[in-house]
Amino acid sequence: MESNGSVSSMVNLEKFLCERLVDQSQPISERFRALFSLRNLKGPGPRNALILASRDSSNLLAHEAAFALGQMQDAEAIPALESVLNDMSLHPIVRHEAAEALGAIGLAGNVNILKKSLSSDPAQEVRETCELALKRIEDMSNVDAENQSSTTEKSPFMSVDPAGPAASFSSVHQLRQVLLDETKGMYERYAALFALRNHGGEEAVSAIVDSLSASSALLRHEVAYVLGQLQSKTALATLSKVLRDVNEHPMVRHEAAEALGSIADEQSIALLEEFSKDPEPIVAQSCEVALSMLEFENSGKSFEFFFTQDPLVH
């Protein structure tokens, strides 16, 4: 049984994190520290703070808050995520993440919400996300009906992926063909991507790197995200090229920046420092957060807030 002091500290920590997340006077890296800490907590406090943050003026923070709500699979967040998805004043990267979160939560009641945006949202990346989310929910429903093990369970990387990995008996060559095939459906290509990620190895990484030339910005951004999970230096040159390309979609450059932060060699760090001044805020803030995370890691400290006593608030 927890002591009263322990409960009090936890309550104070939660309050501190919620306030820090929505405090626009704080550096973006500090707000991300709060966000990454809150996604490990449950209940109305963290949920409501993340919902509020999903409409923040920082599109990077807003989209990460929506992503966190999806990873938490909190059904109570569905009305707020629907509102974000339907708000055309919000950046497509935020609406996309709301759609993905609805797919991650995975309830059948989200189908009509997603179908509406699939047919009406002006942004291709949002429509493609709705397509993925609908297929994920369909797959989950089929698994429940057949009482079989799910292909949409949490990945070895502890993430709720927008698609389950393709069948494990597929070869790397077969998966590569599917991933690079522009005539295949988005869900099938995502499934190949996650199967290649789970397979690992240089041949699989090479196939993933090659798919950064895909015509879909949504797929390219997921590819960069996966390369960050794999932390493979094989991808360094291609990720650097993506970050440097000012004509690339900000959501793709942002994921490339985060992936470079995961690789964290001298060249990656130099690039992050250079592009932390990029005119596109999504890119600049991604670099700033990645550099801050590396600074904490190199000093042996956790980027997330963990307190054994009440946090000091100045």
From Swiss-Prot:
UniProt GO MF annotations: deoxyhypusine monooxygenase activity; metal ion binding
SMART domains recorded: EZ_HEAT (SM00567)
Binding, Fe cation 2: H221, E222, H254, E255
Cofactor, free-text remark: Binds 2 Fe(2+) ions per subunit.
UniProt key word Iron: yes
GO biological process per UniProt: peptidyl-lysine modification to peptidyl-hypusine
Co-factor(s): Fe(2+)
HEAT-like PBS-type repeats: 61-87, 94-120, 188-214, 219-245, 252-278
InterPro entries per the UniProt record, alphabetical: ARM-like, ARM-type_fold, Deoxyhypusine_hydroxylase, PBS_lyase_HEAT
Coiled-coil features, chain-numbered ranges: none
Disulfide bond positions: none
Residues modified as N-acetylmethionine: M1
Reactions listed under catalytic activity: [eIF5A protein]-deoxyhypusine + AH2 + O2 = [eIF5A protein]-hypusine + A + H2O
Keyword Iron found: yes
Keywords: Acetylation, Hypusine biosynthesis, Iron, Metal-binding, Monooxygenase, Oxidoreductase, Repeat
Listed pathway(s): Protein modification; eIF5A hypusination
Binding site for Fe cation 1: H63, E64, H96, E97
Family: Belongs to the deoxyhypusine hydroxylase family.
Protein name: Deoxyhypusine hydroxylase
Organism, scientific name: Arabidopsis thaliana (Mouse-ear cress)
Biological classification of the source: Eukaryota, Viridiplantae, Streptophyta, Embryophyta, Tracheophyta
